[in-house]
Curated annotation (Swiss-Prot):
GO molecular function terms attached to this record: DNA binding; DNA polymerase processivity factor activity
GO biological process: leading strand elongation; regulation of DNA replication
Listed PANTHER family: PROLIFERATING CELL NUCLEAR ANTIGEN
Name of the molecule in the record: DNA polymerase sliding clamp
Length: 246
């Protein structure tokens, strides 16, 4: 038996993030809360979200259970709700029931065995920069009509995001005094597919800062928190494979 109650804003942001890389997802619910890990079909990007039970208005489960869902069906339910509402969620056999104010709706669950939960790779780097989300987004937006990739550079002086084509280029330069926190005693560079980053940054609306970690030609790790509930923040991790330059 699963009975949950969560803010529509939180559920929408979780769903928006997952929909940037997958069409189906499997949620795990246990005594600690709810979590989900998903990887896109090309194995380029991965998202991990951990929702502590304190983030729920109501949280009840008889034990560990899995809920597999079609993301578009979930989004269709969320569209019926006001952003200021909470949504009640109950697992009833092979269906998931939703209570949204005066509206009750149910959707069919998928077979959890058909969705593989990927293992999170051991990606670590001692080099990182904590950036304002607004600064990072501006750098990505400046590059979106120029190229399909963007190169990040981190040094003792700060962080740069550079993109170019045969006729155009863009560069965002953040000196270290505009960076919330950083650790780097050398110069590292790596390029990443811009499309994934733009979808990701568009989907997260409630976070103020992002922790970027990478090395030369190495996967990018972005750690963040969704801030709808300051006392019980939803922890997020976004991993992105590098774009190898010729």
């Amino acid at each position: 038996m699963i009975r949950l109650n969560l803010s529509v804003k939180n559920l929408k942001e979780i769903t928006d993030l997952l929909s940037t890389i997958v069409s189906e997802a499997k949620f795990r619910v246990d005594e600690n809360g709810m979590s989900v890990t998903a990887v896109d079909p090309a194995h380029v990007a991965m998202i991990r979200l951990e929702v502590p039970k304190e983030a729920f208005v109501e949280f009840h489960t008889d034990g560990q259970e899995e809920i597999a869902l079609d993301i578009d069906r979930l989004k269709s339910v969320i569209r019926l709700a006001s952003s200021s509402e909470n949504v009640g969620i109950t697992k009833d056999g092979e269906k998931l029931k939703f209570e949204l104010g005066t509206i009750n709706k149910s959707i069919s669950l998928l077979d959890p065995s058909t969705i593989v939960t990927p293992k999170i790779p051991n990606i670590t780097s001692e080099y990182y920069a904590v950036l304002k989300k607004s600064d990072f987004e501006r750098g990505l937006r400046a590059a979106e009509d120029i190229s399909d990739s963007i190169r990040f550079t981190l040094s003792q002086d700060g962080f740069k995001a550079y993109s170019h084509s045969e006729s155009e280029e863009s560069e965002m330069i953040l000196p270290k005094d505009l960076i919330t926190d950083m650790s780097c005693n050398t110069t590292i560079k790596s390029s990443y597919p811009l499309e994934y980053l733009l979808k990701f940054i568009k989907a997260i609306s409630s976070t103020d800062s992002l922790k970027l970690s990478f090395r030369d030609d190495y996967p990018l790790s972005v750690e963040f928190y969704l801030d709808q509930n300051p006392g019980a923040k939803i922890k997020g991790l976004f991993l992105l494979a590098p774009r190898m330059e010729q």
